[in-house]
Curated annotation (Swiss-Prot):
Predominant cellular place of this UniProt entry's protein: cytoplasm
The protein, known as: Beta-ketoacyl-[acyl-carrier-protein] synthase III 2
Subunit structure: Homodimer.
Catalytic residues of the enzyme: C118, H246, N276
Organism: Streptomyces coelicolor (strain ATCC BAA-471 / A3(2) / M145)
HAMAP family per record: FabH
GO function term, MF aspect, one: 3-oxoacyl-[acyl-carrier-protein] synthase activity
Taxonomic classification: Bacteria, Bacillati, Actinomycetota, Actinomycetes, Kitasatosporales
Keyword Cytoplasm on entry: yes
Amino acid sequence: MSAARGGRAGAVVTGVGTCLPETVVDNDEVSRHLDTDHAWIHSRTGIERRRRVSPGTTTGDLAVTAGAAALKSAGRDDCDLVLLATTTPDRRCPATAPRVASRLGLRAAAAFDLSAVCSGFVYGLSVASAMITAGTCDRALVIGADVYSSIVDPDDRGTAVVFGDGAGAVLLERGDTGDPGAVLHTELGSDGTGDELITIPPDGAYLTMRGSDVYTRAVTTMAESARSTAAHAGWDLADVDAFVGHQANLRILTSVAKRLRLPPERVVSNIADVANTAAASIPLALADAAAQGRIGSGDRLLLTAFGGGLTWGSAAVVWSGAEPVQDQRS
């Protein structure tokens, strides 16, 4: 499914904000509970450390802080849509987004959760952009937030070393496809025949993942999706200033970039410091890249993600030059 931006009406990114827990857990600490060590983890994932929430801190807590940061980044204090992409809602029912909106003082805003696992943020970006373009709303807060420490078995080496907790958000506003920050094209897809590759079994409490199978599917699918999205945006891949992929595994990012023939300096990666933060990974990477001066106003960004479901999605965005607001909480 594609959502191309027709005419001149469109959505633009005007702010970006993040929230990371204060607690840092490095590979040595993780290794104490597992048959592994820093060298093994780093060589296979590129991860050196991850963040973990304190007991009692929820996905909603992180989402509120990241959402407030994105609003502050854009110089706004309100919006009419809050879309929360997450696999770890605070409750099974009701959705977490309405409570997040209320805590942000947005009591009349539409709000709902979206579940597309690690593709969730790109799905949310696409849905919110389409709603703005259609005139359903004027300003939308898209938040990706996950607390995977709540669904990962600490004794499972295949998942315990991979995931971290965090949240990231962007503010989208009605604008023009020629404006800085424009979301030019998004593309989404899924394949339910692979739903067992990343799953929480019906009778289980923890996430399970078939890593080698996920790697193969992710590399092929992310490259195809990114290539198609760039073409629909009217870009040659050589025109892409920064490739911002889901931070699942450094090997995946490197392999996808090679297939797209993008040089390493154009690949945004912060997985070493935050690990795989699921729906939060792309906005966290965007904020870090902006804070470090790796992306600037007018840069062409190619975003792509792959997650459980199986789901995937990509977006072509012209960066607005928004200054990120990056916060922490316990």
